[in-house]
């Protein structure tokens, strides 16, 4: 039975830490707030999400190509993009604890709890730490970009920024891609990479962090077709999450109000997931924005390079509009884990029913595709099982485990989402066959050892 998401989130966070999906960064030194490292299972899970996104958005289409641009970009790029001027958040400080918060986040949390804005503004908002009636400083603007200096001296000339989004690296390479890849609108450029934002209030596990990964694509279109393409990408990206196992009831679309649109956007629609956070359970997975011609126009103006496109078929020249589906990789990571978590019952070695925790991940996302398990640690069984695991490892990420009772080893694999367990038993020594157990229904099937690779291949398509 699937428990309510609100009660699942803490369980999944604990599972992620305990089983090696995610570790607090620098933990032996006390850690860094909202910074996380991805362990053996987490790094495989992340790579699988990226692989599915890349196949769906880039290599699975003839109208999209890939790019990997630099994390550090010149200051002029961010001046042109508007980030230096407008990439600010209103910051207030509690006069009780002297902690700083985004004013808009405090107000949004109040609205989510009470169903209306605070009548007297910040004066009605209690201190999040102490619960006392809040006493706040006046809001101040806080730039969220992280600075760095290149060269031996920290001067204005060497000032650069760590990118707060991957998009600008795509825009400044627009002309390069058009020329070398021989592309013309409608076409897109996709990119996966790290971005950095000096968030005032990071938190909610890996949902909001200062260092994060984005899966972004900029789709360049003739201006009159922008609205149609925008809706196409909203629908396409929403369906991607559903096809990879997210329950549609836990997804929704959120239309940004006109007064809260980013400086470049004509319309933005967020794909949100019901994470189960306190206050407001919904959180953004991905934003799909119509950025109009803002980006190419501003970079043309500031760089002096013509970034318009000449259409020979219509003998016309125009600045393409941009439709941007921008997904958070680590937010997707978190949503897929939460949505896959199920608790049911399974018999133990004595036949008694016990609680079983399962990650019912789509096999394409599962960090381990199959586990090879000798029935027991035995001089004849373990080597045979190891040889089979080595053969299968040529194709997939495979675990070998011969420690403990077979039932416990099944549970360990269920808990990390492994779709198949292959058991080598004493009969295997005679008939050269193994038992394949399915994760979700625990059904078992006996097949020849030399047929295991073909058996899994037929059931792990797209992995």
UniProtKB/Swiss-Prot annotation:
One of its GO terms (molecular function) is glycine-tRNA ligase activity. Homodimer. It comes from Mycolicibacterium paratuberculosis (strain ATCC BAA-968 / K-10). Its EC number is 6.1.1.14. Coiled coil: none annotated. It is an enzyme of class 6 (ligase). The gene is glyQS. Substrate binds at residues 102, 165, 212-216, 324-328. ATP binds at residues 197-199, 207-212, 284-285, 328-331. It is found in: Cytoplasm. The keyword Nuclease does not apply. Its main location: cytoplasm. This is Glycine--tRNA ligase. SUPFAM superfamilies: Class II aaRS ABD-related, Class II aaRS and biotin synthetases. Pfam families: HGTP_anticodon, tRNA-synt_2b.
């Amino acid at each position: 039975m699937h428990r309510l998401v609100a009660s699942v989130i803490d369980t999944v966070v604990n599972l992620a830490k305990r089983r090696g999906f995610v570790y607090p960064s620098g933990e032996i030194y006390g850690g860094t707030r909202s910074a996380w490292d991805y362990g053996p299972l987490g790094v495989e899970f992340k790579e699988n999400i990226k692989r599915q996104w890349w196949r769906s958005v880039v290599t699975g289409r003839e109208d999209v190509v890939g790019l990997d641009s630099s994390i550090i970009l010149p200051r002029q790029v961010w001046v042109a993009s508007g980030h230096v001027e407008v990439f600010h958040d209103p910051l207030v400080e509690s006069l009780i604890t002297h902690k700083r918060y985004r004013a808009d986040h405090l107000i949004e949390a109040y609205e989510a709890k009470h169903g209306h804005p605070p009548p007297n503004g910040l004066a009605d908002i209690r201190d999040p730490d102490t619960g006392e009636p809040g006493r706040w400083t006046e809001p101040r603007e806080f730039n969220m970009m992280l600075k760095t200096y290149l060269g031996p001296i920290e001067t204005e000339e060497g000032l650069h920024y760590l990118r707060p989004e991957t998009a600008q690296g795509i825009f400044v390479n627009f002309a390069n891609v058009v020329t070398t890849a021989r592309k013309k609108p409608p076409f897109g450029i996709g990119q996966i990479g790290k971005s950095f934002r000096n968030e005032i209030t990071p938190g909610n596990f890996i949902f909001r962090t200062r260092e994060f990964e984005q899966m972004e694509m900029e789709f360049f279109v003739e201006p009159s077709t922008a609205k149609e393409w925008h809706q196409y990408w909203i629908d396409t990206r929403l369906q991607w999450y559903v096809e990879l196992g997210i329950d549609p009831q836990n997804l929704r679309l959120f239309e940004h109000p006109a007064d809260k649109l980013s400086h470049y956007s004509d319309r933005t629609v967020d794909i949100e997931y019901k994470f189960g956070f306190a206050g407001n359970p919904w959180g953004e997975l991905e934003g799909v924005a119509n950025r109009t011609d803002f980006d190419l126009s501003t970079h043309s103006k500031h760089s002096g390079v013509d970034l318009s496109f000449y259409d020979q078929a219509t003998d016309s020249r125009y600045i393409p509009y941009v439709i941007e589906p921008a997904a958070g990789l680590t937010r997707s990571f978190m949503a897929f884990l939460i949505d896959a978590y199920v608790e049911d019952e399974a018999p133990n070695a004595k036949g008694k029913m016990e609680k079983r925790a399962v990650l019912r991940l789509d096999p394409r996302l599962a960090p381990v595709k199959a586990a090879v398990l000798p029935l027991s640690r035995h001089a004849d069984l373990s080597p045979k099982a190891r040889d089979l695991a080595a053969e299968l490892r040529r194709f997939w990420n495979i675990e070998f485990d011969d420690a403990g009772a077979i039932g416990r080893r099944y549970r360990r694999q269920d808990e990390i989402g492994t779709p198949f367990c292959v058991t080598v038993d004493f009969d295997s020594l005679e008939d050269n066959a193994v038992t394949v157990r399915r994760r979700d229904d625990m059904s078992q099937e006996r097949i020849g050892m030399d047929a295991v690779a073909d058996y899994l291949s037929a059931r792990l398509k797209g992995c």
